Amino acid sequence: MAPGKGGYKQINKALNICAFEDYLDGQQATLPPLQDVEQISPRVIRVLGQNPGKFTLQGTNTYIVGTGSERLIIDTGQGIPDWADLISTTLLDGNFSLSHVLLTHWHGDHTGGVPDLLRLYPDLISGIYKHTPSKIQQPIEDGQVFKVEGATVRAVHAPGHSSDHMCFILEEEQAMFTGDNVLGHGTSAVEHLSTWMAALQQMKSHNCRKGYPAHGIVINDLQGRITGQLAQKFRRERQVLKALEQVKSQERAMAGGRGKGSVTVKQLVSTMHGDSLDGGIRELALEPFTEEILRKLAEDGKVAFEIRTGIKKWFVVGTALD
């Protein structure tokens, strides 16, 4: 499949991806190449999903885990026939079989290869596991343990990118399969920002050193990557709060100390970034991102909104920057 053509679009529905085409094209061009099949640790073989794209990066990483004659696999790619061929060849060459299929979440670039696995290995029909399973799948509970020779894998429910998102800890390596919550390059799109940030805090609490992401290279300092991702989001929150405080102060200075300083998202973006922004970037990217941050801050009790003449306007609550 040609780079840039494949990939399951997993992004906030409010966000129009056209605003990011140039950035995504540039990012994809600089990605390091990954081997189709690579033994990345004594217990882990990475098999690329053969679906490179702007959202899937080099392709979906699927992981065969264990050292014995029966192993488990995490994620199944997008349903590309070449991936199924790689899996079949890898199992044949290694003289081992699969006993469990663990799915990180429902997105098609992670579950699309399940029919191919069942075609190749019908006995797996009772061994497919996912949080919030379909009829042919088994449930995964938070803390559930899966064991094969050489590997103990513990499930961690970590929603945010999606409500059913699971990560998996490989106990023997103090490593975590991070799914789409933390990627090998860049940052992930999320369904719910507050939930995702809480999930990252939870992931960090397990003190795993290494991360095996669903897209991109191995993360050698998982703790540092998570810390950096959270710090970036907190910086953006503070930028939004600072801008709201600025608007509030200006309004009160002009109104004798009265006023909430409520503004629309469009007005807030202008306060933060000026009025000379490209219209597409503003409307298709910055405004949806800013509103997502505002919703998270509202859940935290730091901002609120009011409806004036049918228009939603946001304002800071108290001294939110303290």
From Swiss-Prot:
<dbReference type="InterPro" id="IPR036866">
    <property type="entry name" value="RibonucZ/Hydroxyglut_hydro"/>
</dbReference>
<feature type="active site" description="Proton donor/acceptor">
    <location>
        <position position="109"/>
    </location>
</feature>
<keyword id="KW-0378">Hydrolase</keyword>
<dbReference type="GO" id="GO:0044550">
    <property type="term" value="P:secondary metabolite biosynthetic process"/>
</dbReference>
<feature type="binding site">
    <location>
        <position position="109"/>
    </location>
    <ligand>
        <name>Zn(2+) 2</name>
    </ligand>
</feature>
<dbReference type="GO" id="GO:0016787">
    <property type="term" value="F:hydrolase activity"/>
</dbReference>
<protein>
    <recommendedName>
        <fullName>Atrochrysone carboxyl ACP thioesterase dmxR1</fullName>
        <ecNumber>3.1.2.-</ecNumber>
    </recommendedName>
</protein>
<dbReference type="InterPro" id="IPR050662">
    <property type="entry name" value="Sec-metab_biosynth-thioest"/>
</dbReference>
<comment type="function">
    <text>Atrochrysone carboxyl ACP thioesterase; part of the gene cluster that mediates the biosynthesis of the dimeric xanthones cryptosporioptides. The pathway begins with the synthesis of atrochrysone thioester by the polyketide synthase dmx-nrPKS. The atrochrysone carboxyl ACP thioesterase dmxR1 then breaks the thioester bond and releases the atrochrysone carboxylic acid from dmx-nrPKS. Atrochrysone carboxylic acid is decarboxylated by the decarboxylase dmxR15, and oxidized by the anthrone oxygenase dmxR16 to yield emodin. Emodin is then reduced to emodin hydroquinone by the oxidoreductase dmxR7.</text>
</comment>
<feature type="binding site">
    <location>
        <position position="110"/>
    </location>
    <ligand>
        <name>Zn(2+) 2</name>
    </ligand>
</feature>
<keyword id="KW-0479">Metal-binding</keyword>
<feature type="binding site">
    <location>
        <position position="107"/>
    </location>
    <ligand>
        <name>Zn(2+) 1</name>
    </ligand>
</feature>
<dbReference type="InterPro" id="IPR047921">
    <property type="entry name" value="LACTB2-like_MBL-fold"/>
</dbReference>
<dbReference type="Pfam" id="PF00753">
    <property type="entry name" value="Lactamase_B"/>
</dbReference>
<feature type="binding site">
    <location>
        <position position="105"/>
    </location>
    <ligand>
        <name>Zn(2+) 1</name>
    </ligand>
</feature>
<comment type="similarity">
    <text>Belongs to the metallo-beta-lactamase superfamily.</text>
</comment>
<dbReference type="InterPro" id="IPR036388">
    <property type="entry name" value="WH-like_DNA-bd_sf"/>
</dbReference>
<keyword id="KW-0862">Zinc</keyword>
<dbReference type="InterPro" id="IPR001279">
    <property type="entry name" value="Metallo-B-lactamas"/>
</dbReference>
<comment type="pathway">
    <text>Secondary metabolite biosynthesis.</text>
</comment>
<dbReference type="GO" id="GO:0046872">
    <property type="term" value="F:metal ion binding"/>
</dbReference>
